[in-house]
Amino acid sequence: MSNAQLETAIEAAWEARDTISPATTGETREAIEETLNALDSGALRVAERGADGSWHVNQWAKKAVLLGFRIKDMEAQSGGPQGGGWWDKVDSKFLGWNSGAWEKAGFRAVPSCVVRKSAYIAPGVVLMPSFVNLGAYVDEGTMVDTWATVGSCAQIGKNVHLSGGVGIGGVLEPMQAGPTIIEDNCFIGARSEVVEGCIVREGSVLGMGVFIGQSTKIVDRETGEVMYGEVPPYSVVVAGSMPSKNGVNLYCAVIVKRVDERTRSKTGINELLRD
């Protein structure tokens, strides 16, 4: 089916979602599975960046991810420690892969990383022991470091570094209108969290322990401007606080400067790790 046909079928299935089950067959099942496969291969994305920098969300693709839960039963999944396993209804992205499939995919997956079916991982990506949820998109040259999590349908750009323990929020629970987006060439410091469909624009650097949601104040130190939901391009952001009522200071994120050569030297991509 074309994307237009898939969208029509998925929207119809969404309206009748309470009737969809593992027993569902025909066009509805085919549309759901074909959409999930397109997301998995990178042929389709939940969100796409336009030439003007705005992001368009394919809501129907996100709906297909949710409908995928309706068409499969829970089942045992092997591969756990001491012969154990897991109990789930979403396959691993790597189910049935042989050496040829790995070589064609072109990314590196360190033992104990988890990637669920319908997430796309581009060539040149390095996955340390981390978790990438369904419907996500991780673009070329990105490092997903140890214990970092990429939430459902999140969009991660090229040459991004997600440091240890970073959390990038998903869209499925609680339901979000748009995915969390980290654009190209960003560095997200250890244990930072970006959630609730926020956007970190190209080339930005978040210091260690920066938390950004839709209600987080993002303050430009130079101008005093307060913004929400989006970090401007090439910003250097650290955790801070602002005075509130009764002498209480509340958390905020502070843009302390724009990225310069000194910042780049500290946060640059190491090509040796991607050979």
Swiss-Prot record:
Sorted alphabetically, which Gene3D superfamilies does this protein's record hold? Hexapeptide repeat proteins (2.160.10.10), Tetrahydrodipicolinate-N-succinyltransferase, N-terminal domain (1.10.166.10)
Task: Give me the residues that bind substrate, please.
Answer: R108, D145
Its annotated pathway reads: Amino-acid biosynthesis; L-lysine biosynthesis via DAP pathway; LL-2,6-diaminopimelate from (S)-tetrahydrodipicolinate (succinylase route): step 1/3
- What lineage does UniProt assign to this protein's organism? Bacteria, Pseudomonadati, Pseudomonadota, Alphaproteobacteria, Rhodobacterales
Taxonomic superkingdom: Bacteria
Report what the protein is called: 2,3,4,5-tetrahydropyridine-2,6-dicarboxylate N-succinyltransferase
GO CC terms of this entry: cytoplasm
Q: Which reaction does it catalyse?
A: (S)-2,3,4,5-tetrahydrodipicolinate + succinyl-CoA + H2O = (S)-2-succinylamino-6-oxoheptanedioate + CoA
TM region(s), chain numbering: none
**PROSITE patterns, per database record:** HEXAPEP_TRANSFERASES
Classification via HAMAP family = DapD (MF_00811)
Q: Which InterPro entries match?
A: DapD_Trfase_Hexpep_rpt_fam, Hexapep, Hexapep_transf_CS, THP_succinylTrfase_dom1, THP_succinylTrfase_N_sf, Trimer_LpxA-like_sf
Biological process (GO), any one: diaminopimelate biosynthetic process
Q: Which family does it belong to?
A: Belongs to the transferase hexapeptide repeat family.
Q: What's the subunit arrangement here?
A: Homotrimer.
